[in-house]
């Protein structure tokens, strides 16, 4: 090989290496940003040291372009982290345990509080999608 061809191959490999480094932001950094966001409930932030959300999400291979379904999100501890993480390129869906024949008052209260919280922050939660979930027929992720 001539020196010019070697330089050409080196330049191509070097350019590809640089381009690979210019990809999407590191998921770890995006999780850090979500964990430090101002919209998070202060008492939930305090829980992070016990629940280890960053480590958990990295362990499960979270990707900001994924579709996520959170079953019964409670008052939204994980939602505060997940929703902004996947807001632009992924899809966040949540379910509640509303049953056809009987609705437990606790779950009605929980769902109402969750929805109210989401409505107060449309800049973060406007892309959320509610999916009906019946534990007796657990099909909630059509295609």
Regions found by a protein language model. Give the residues of each.
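Conserved class I S-adenosyl-L-methionine
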Residues: 65-74
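Conserved SAM-binding loop of SAM-dependent methyltransferases across substrates and taxa
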Residues: 75-88
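A short acidic, Gly/Pro-enriched loop at the edge of an enzyme's catalytic core
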Residues: 138-143
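Class I SAM-dependent methyltransferase Rossmann-like catalytic core
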Residues: 30-59, 63
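Bacterial signal peptide processing site
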Residues: 23-25
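Conserved SAM-binding strand-loop segment of SAM-dependent methyltransferases
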Residues: 123-136
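C-terminal motif of bacterial Sec signal peptides marking the signal peptidase cleavage site
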Residues: 19-21
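Bacterial N-terminal signal peptides that target proteins for export
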Residues: 2-11
């Amino acid at each position: 090989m001539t020196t010019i061809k070697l330089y050409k191959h080196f330049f191509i490999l070097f350019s590809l290496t640089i381009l690979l480094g210019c990809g999407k932001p590191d998921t770890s950094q995006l999780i850090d940003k979500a964990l430090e966001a101002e919209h998070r409930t202060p008492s939930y932030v305090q829980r992070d040291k016990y629940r280890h959300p960053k480590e958990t999400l990295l362990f499960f291979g979270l990707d900001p372009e994924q579709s996520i379904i959170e079953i019964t999100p409670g008052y939204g501890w994980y939602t505060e982290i997940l929703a902004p993480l996947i807001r632009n390129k992924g899809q966040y869906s949540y379910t509640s345990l509303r049953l056809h024949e009987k609705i437990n008052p606790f779950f009605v209260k929980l769902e109402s509080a969750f929805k109210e919280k989401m409505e107060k922050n449309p800049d973060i939660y406007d892309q959320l999608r509610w999916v009906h979930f019946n534990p007796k027929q657990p099909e909630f992720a059509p295609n």
